[in-house]
């Protein structure tokens, strides 16, 4: 996963959100280091939908907003990528600590 798609999936892991909600949640989670433009977000969401990592929910209130939710497969991929990055960080930490000596 790219950093942006990781944050999009992470934002959706706690609750379904509409596009603007995803943008704001990603900004919050990333401490404003990831600022998604609308075009970038919707392109990423389309790719995530094609990969079956995100679904678009049907809204009954006649709203024009599209709400997205993470799928079970999306949660698995997010968890796997988290563990991959965690392992990478542990390896880097070990190497960098050796370099400090």
Task: Locate each region found by the language model.
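N-terminal helix-turn-helix DNA-binding core of bacterial DNA-binding proteins
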Residues: 1-40
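A generic structural signal for ordered secondary structure
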Residues: 19, 30, 65, 93-96
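Conserved anionic group-binding/transfer micro-motifs
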Residues: 22, 41, 74, 85
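Short, well-ordered turn and helix-capping elements at secondary-structure junctions
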Residues: 26, 30, 58-60, 72-74
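Basic amphipathic alpha-helical segments that dock to polyanions
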Residues: 41-42, 48
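Beta-hairpin "wing" of winged helix-turn-helix
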Residues: 49-64, 69
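Basic, amphipathic "hinge/linker" alpha-helix immediately C-terminal to the N-terminal HTH DNA-binding motif
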Residues: 62-82
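Amphipathic alpha-helical dimerization/coiled-coil segments
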Residues: 76-101
């Amino acid at each position: 996963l790219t950093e942006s798609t990781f944050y999009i999936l992470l934002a959706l892991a706690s609750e379904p959100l509409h596009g603007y909600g995803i943008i704001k949640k990603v900004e919050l989670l990333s401490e404003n280091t990831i600022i998604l433009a609308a075009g970038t977000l919707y392109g990423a969401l389309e790719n995530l939908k094609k990969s079956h990592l995100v679904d678009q929910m049907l809204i009954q209130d006649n709203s024009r907003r599209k709400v997205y939710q993470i799928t079970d497969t999306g949660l698995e991929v997010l968890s796997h990528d988290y563990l991959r990055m965690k392992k990478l960080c542990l390896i880097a930490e070990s190497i960098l600590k050796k370099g400090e000596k």
